[in-house]
Amino acid sequence: MWKSILAIAIGAAAGALLRWFLGLRLNSLFPSLPPGTLAANLVGGYIIGVAVALFADMPMLSPLWRLLIITGFCGGLTTFSTFSAEVVDLLRQGQLQPAFAAIAVHVSGSLLMTMAGIASWQWLRR
């Protein structure tokens, strides 16, 4: 149990630090669609795609790796709550077009990046 908790905590801390760094570096570039949050969600979608495919192909890997990468790192990196708050803020400001653009880009982009991650792993294992 303690190993699982430690794996999740280490992964979550690393993911959250990367999310903070992306926001710090990117959000001022285009505030109406904060690119740091978008980058975190797209990168996280890609990483989780690779991880899901990798763990499916390598069931002999310790479950601690899955907890570290998927539950911890991707959970700490991706940020649905921040995305939701940013969209609601845009809606409250009457910025409907940027709000709906953010929804479309985050959701479709994350799904596409997850599929790209799975495809990347399948390509790499050949």
Curated annotation (Swiss-Prot):
Its main location: membrane. Pfam families: CRCB. The keyword Ligase does not apply. The keyword Membrane applies. It is a multi-pass membrane protein. Keywords: Cell inner membrane, Cell membrane, Ion channel, Ion transport, Membrane, Metal-binding, Sodium, Transmembrane, Transmembrane helix, Transport. One of its GO terms (molecular function) is metal ion binding. The chain crosses the membrane at residues 4-24, 36-56, 68-88, 99-119. Na(+) is not transported, but it plays an essential structural role and its presence is essential for fluoride channel function. One of its GO terms (biological process) is cellular detoxification of fluoride. Fluoride-specific ion channel. Important for reducing fluoride concentration in the cell, thus reducing its toxicity. This is Fluoride-specific ion channel FluC. It comes from Chromobacterium violaceum (strain ATCC 12472 / DSM 30191 / JCM 1249 / CCUG 213 / NBRC 12614 / NCIMB 9131 / NCTC 9757 / MK). The gene is fluC.
